[in-house]
Curated annotation (Swiss-Prot):
Coiled coil: none annotated. GO terms for molecular function: acyl-L-homoserine-lactone lactonohydrolase activity; arylesterase activity; metal ion binding; protein homodimerization activity. This is Serum paraoxonase/arylesterase 2. Capable of hydrolyzing lactones and a number of aromatic carboxylic acid esters. Has antioxidant activity. Is not associated with high density lipoprotein. Prevents LDL lipid peroxidation, reverses the oxidation of mildly oxidized LDL, and inhibits the ability of MM-LDL to induce monocyte chemotaxis. Glycans are attached at N254, N269, N323. It comes from the Eukaryota. Widely expressed with highest expression in liver, lung, placenta, testis and heart.
Amino acid sequence: MGRLVAVGLLGIALALLGERLLALRNRLKASREVESVDLPHCHLIKGIEAGSEDIDILPNGLAFFSVGLKFPGLHSFAPDKPGGILMMDLKEEKPRARELRISRGFDLASFNPHGISTFIDNDDTVYLFVVNHPEFKNTVEIFKFEEAENSLLHLKTVKHELLPSVNDITAVGPAHFYATNDHYFSDPFLKYLETYLNLHWANVVYYSPNEVKVVAEGFDSANGINISPDDKYIYVADILAHEIHVLEKHTNMNLTQLKVLELDTLVDNLSIDPSSGDIWVGCHPNGQKLFVYDPNNPPSSEVLRIQNILSEKPTVTTVYANNGSVLQGSSVASVYDGKLLIGTLYHRALYCEL
């Protein structure tokens, strides 16, 4: 009798494990292949060889790139090279990427930038917020951009127990931001277990020098985050749920969910066209290829444009898609004055004229 019980329990456990594995494959879109959608005027950006995970563009056309992300479980084309911040002036006739100098005293050797966001203060001071994973830990670095010197002055490192697994950030003040935690845990094994069991413990945190609080939760894996041009709404990408959440921002900085847009791809970073309010999304058609890297079958890329997200039927357009032959693992797409920049987790970056 005891053996029958043991065999029965083992069978139940194996069935549950199998069901979770199948569910994870579905969340990763492991069987999906993408059909190419080409743009006619594109070229790879020289100097970006090992990823440009996030991009943010100032109103004057200066674009910031976070490059060189290393992440447990992800491939890297430059595993021994520290990350950095590059800048490109999109108003130039032939824009090129230049690395920004960072002030002395900042630990460049362990710099591992992830999501980024800019904020322009009332006195026109530009702040750059960078999610950083030094030695795979979690901090938010706040810099002052000094345009005349093409440099970043490090102002502050933010660490907090409510920021255990930071992915992306959107700045709403000189030392104020919303950030996504893609996991509840910081330990790599517990992160994997959390993902495997589909616990939906990821969240969004509001940070200010005087208050830190969870303002939205229940996400599978909260990823990209951004704010509408009128500052009324926060958009959050839930990458493994294939969703974009629209949340209303209140005066106390709390968030209330208004709607969820379901998509058929893994949504990564979100960029906003300030002139139209359109959301541009860097997507992963097949997430399994990201984590099990095969140079003969590389991860594909996909860029979506979402118009009128607050309406009953938003318009979703595939602007660009590639099977990995040109661009692998697109994570962000940002537009400025008819120009499109597409960044990746660990591959190249693309410049296109629309």
